Design a protein with these regions (language model features):
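Periplasmic-binding protein-like
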Residues: 1-23, 68-69, 172-180
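Beta->alpha turn/N-cap motifs
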Residues: 90-91, 108-113
């Protein structure tokens, strides 16, 4: 996260702190993100039966802002013993392909109305999973925080609503539904 933010340039880009942007109502600053640790990743790969590493294919956008981040990710993955094979396609084609559930990993950047519910619903509620009739942008097929996302929508106490959003973020991070990389300073 930090390396990508540094590459893209502060103050416009900062390392992300959660699965929703830091300027959103309901943002949780420390949901339990793990640090970048290539040695630990290699050890975990070996323990999982991949002592020589692992290869993952990823369809990526040729759009400049996406392509550079994908190349940085490729280098970071390589440090951990993971070969990220990028298949770069034109941006509109990429949007079509990622909605066909073809990627194990999808890098995505988004701007939405600054309230946690929109991000949590579109990216992490099971009804938004790619392949469903109600699909939005849940590329990971995450379903661990549906209860909290739904409860927050109808909660009338703002403090309780924010706590539901915080708990949803903790669960999403704990289950690695997403690894947030950067946030823009817009």
């Amino acid at each position: 996260r930090e390396q990508i933010a540094q590459f893209r340039g502060e103050p416009f880009t900062r390392a992300a702190g959660s699965v929703i942007p830091m300027n959103n109502l309901g943002y949780l600053a420390n949901p339990g993100l793990l640090p970048h640790d290539p040695a630990k990743a290699k050890a975990l790969l070996a323990e999982a039966g991949y002592p020589n590493g692992l290869t993952i294919k990823m369809i990526g956008s040729q759009m400049g802002s996406y392509e550079t981040v994908q190349q940085l990710l490729q280098a970071q993955f390589q440090q951990s013993g993971i070969t990220l094979e990028l298949q770069q396609v034109e941006h509109a084609t990429w949007h079509q392909m990622i909605r066909k559930d073809l990627n194990a990993i999808t890098g995505y950047s988004a701007a939405r109305f600054p309230v946690a519910d929109i991000y949590l619903t579109q990216f992490y509620h099971s009804a938004s999973s790619i392949g469903k009739p109600t699909a939005a942008t849940n590329f990971s097929h995450c379903d661990v925080a549906d209860k909290e996302i739904e409860a927050a929508r109808t909660e009338t106490d703002p403090a309780k609503q924010i706590e539901y959003w915080h708990e949803a973020q903790r669960k999403i991070v704990a289950h690695v539904c997403a690894v947030p990389l950067t946030a823009t300073g817009q």
